[in-house]
Amino acid sequence: MLKKGKIGMKPTNKIIGIVDGDVLVYRACNKAIKDNLDVRKTFDDIYEEVKMNTACDKYSLHISGGGNFRKEIEQTFLKYKGKRRDKPDNYLECRDYVAKKYKPIMVPNYEADDTASVEAFKYIKNKQLYMLITLDKDWKTIGGLFYNLLHNNLSAVSKVEGIEFFHQQLLTGDAVDNIPGIEGVGPVKANKILKDKSLIEQFEAVIKAYKKHYPEDAISRLN
């Protein structure tokens, strides 16, 4: 079980940046291969650029800990993250370097977005200001300040918007993670199902939609 007490910094009146280290590692690996660079220095440069662009007072770096508890959940339809590409040849070199130098938050069987969620929810409870720094849209389900590393822009996602986004994902699925959702349901249909409903009503509508389309295994598909 993921322990909240070991994740996060002490409360401060300054903003804490919660960084998706997985994204930075992959960026460093790909750039180093493409331009024939030292992957370790490449990571350092990328991380420093992120800090310069976001200007937070403190930073918390998160990297997936290896393995994933979701893969232990029995599924009869699609393999979780079955569509992901193989890791770059220099991935382990970069990841090990980052682990030793930066001491990121890494928990076995949990992904970076899992540990980032734990840290963010801890800050919400303590009224600590934080910024999520990633390009992974899944992090929007957490809510808060959201810095998009792909577009280099900052937006604010409320807790309600984060839950609404999660409900939409349950309906549409996630092609990147190989999560099917409901066949034939895209953003337009999902919005129609969720429109003008409270959060509880939205979740009830999601369950109803799954039971309608998949009467035999609706609940297992939602796991």
PLM-predicted stretches and their roles:
Residues 1-74:
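Non-catalytic, usually N-terminal nucleic-acid engagement modules in DNA/RNA processing proteins
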